[in-house]
């Protein structure tokens, strides 16, 4: 587990450390973030919960879970950079959000979210049931509505692509995901033990 953590910390440092600064490369930086904050984090948490750090952990279900986690982070992460394009460009950091532009970032994120939802639908149907997917989707409705509201506001006034909206989106989507996962945990574990 320590080795896995060292790898995670090393990539995180490489993302913003002046001598390497993966952040200045749009695709490489984005891939580093989404893989390590998405699929790799899924791997670490799942391995730790199961106390299984062997090759036997890598089942198709777990790999597909890693893919879903990576795609969700891939959809969301560019939105966290949307308000800092000027600051990033002054440092020479040409992030994926900077390259896409503000409107392009919203469109890119929307497409990635749609792909993520298709993957989630397939994942839940394959390993659980569609009812659980619908619970997951319902819990995300407030975040989806806020995303659309923020996008419309930003189209009308580019200054709406700011820190405040980014943090609101972060808080709302995190809260919605947490509630969704708690409900799914309850359905899958607590009800079965009753």
Task: List each model region and its residues.
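Transmembrane helix-loop-helix
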Residues: 1-20, 110-164
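Alpha-helical transmembrane segments of integral membrane proteins
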Residues: 3-4, 28, 32-33, 60-68, ...
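Membrane-embedded alpha-helical segments that form the functional core of polytopic membrane enzymes
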Residues: 1-13, 56-79
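Juxtamembrane boundary at the C-terminal end of a transmembrane helix
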Residues: 182-194
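Membrane-interface helix termini and inter-helical loops of multi-pass transporters
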Residues: 49-58, 125, 192-194
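Solvent-exposed interhelical
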Residues: 70-117
């Amino acid at each position: 587990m320590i080795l896995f953590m060292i790898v995670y910390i090393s990539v995180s440092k490489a993302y913003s450390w002046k001598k390497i600064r993966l952040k200045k490369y749009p695709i490489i930086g984005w891939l580093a973030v989404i893989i390590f904050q998405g699929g790799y984090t899924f791997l670490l948490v799942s391995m730790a919960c199961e106390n299984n750090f062997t090759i036997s952990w890598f089942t198709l279900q777990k790999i597909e879970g890693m893919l879903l986690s990576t795609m969700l982070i891939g959809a969301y992460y560019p939105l966290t950079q949307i308000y800092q394009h000027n600051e990033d460009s002054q440092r020479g950091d040409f992030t994926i959000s900077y390259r896409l532009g503000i409107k392009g970032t919203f469109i890119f994120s929307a497409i990635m979210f749609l792909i993520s939802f298709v993957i989630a639908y397939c994942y839940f149907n394959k390993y659980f049931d569609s009812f659980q997917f619908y619970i997951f989707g319902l819990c995300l409705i407030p975040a989806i509505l806020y995303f659309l509201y923020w996008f419309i506001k930003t189209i009308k006034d580019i200054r709406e692509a700011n820190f405040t909206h980014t943090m609101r989106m972060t808080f709302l989507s995190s809260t919605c995901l947490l509630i969704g996962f708690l409900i799914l945990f309850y359905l899958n574990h607590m009800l079965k033990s009753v």
